[in-house]
């Protein structure tokens, strides 16, 4: 193998080509590779953050669902208590109304009984005086008749 001027010329051209590539071609290629590497790393970080956010969102949704169920159960329990309270109040009101009506009816019965007793006393007194007049055969004056009826009614 002969080393001649062509080989030296080619070596110099190759060396200039390598310097040219190192100066003008290689830096943009390296920059593009580094930028691409940074974008990929950022994308992986974003994916990891999104996965963590998704997991947190699932946990938060589960917690809110549990809280909503607990709140719904509490509302149902309060509604049941209120319904029982309303039923008890209605029962107490009905009982009180029944007792009031019973007392009112008892008072009316007593009043009617007293009225009937008074009327019966007056009738008995009148009958007694009439019977006494017939037995005695004489009439008793009105004043004596009134006193006798009052006395007899008081005794009965």
Curated annotation (Swiss-Prot):
Q: Which organism is it from?
A: Pseudomonas paraeruginosa (strain DSM 24068 / PA7) (Pseudomonas aeruginosa (strain PA7))
Q: Which gene encodes it?
A: atpF
GO CC terms, sorted? plasma membrane; proton-transporting ATP synthase complex
**Subunit description:** F-type ATPases have 2 components, F(1) - the catalytic core - and F(0) - the membrane proton channel. F(1) has five subunits: alpha(3), beta(3), gamma(1), delta(1), epsilon(1). F(0) has three main subunits: a(1), b(2) and c(10-14). The alpha and beta chains form an alternating ring which encloses part of the gamma chain. F(1) is attached to F(0) by a central stalk formed by the gamma and epsilon chains, while a peripheral stalk is formed by the delta and b chains.
List the residue ranges forming a coiled coil, or say none.
none
Provide the family line: Belongs to the ATPase B chain family.
Subcellular location(s) of the protein: Cell inner membrane
Transmembrane parts of this sequence? 12-32
Q: Which lineage do the record's taxonomy fields give for this organism?
A: Bacteria, Pseudomonadati, Pseudomonadota, Gammaproteobacteria, Pseudomonadales
Name the membrane topology term: Single-pass membrane protein
**What is the name of this protein?**
ATP synthase subunit b
């Amino acid at each position: 193998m002969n080393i001649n001027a062509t080989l030296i010329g080619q070596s110099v051209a190759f060396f200039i080509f390598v310097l040219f590539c190192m100066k003008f071609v290689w830096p943009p290629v390296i920059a593009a590779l580094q930028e691409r590497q940074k974008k990929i790393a950022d994308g992986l970080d974003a994916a990891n953050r999104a996965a963590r956010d998704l997991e947190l969102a699932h946990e938060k949704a589960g917690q809110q669902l549990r809280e909503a169920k607990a709140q719904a159960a509490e509302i149902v329990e309060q509604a049941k208590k209120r319904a029982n309270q309303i039923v008890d109040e209605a029962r107490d009101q009905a009982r009180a109304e029944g007792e009031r009506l019973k007392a009112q009816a008892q008072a009316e019965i007593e009043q009617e009984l007293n009225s009937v007793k008074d009327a019966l006393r007056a009738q008995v007194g009148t009958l007694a005086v009439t019977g006494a007049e017939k037995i005695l055969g004489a009439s008793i004056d009105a004043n004596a008749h009134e006193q006798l009826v009052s006395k007899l009614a008081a005794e009965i």
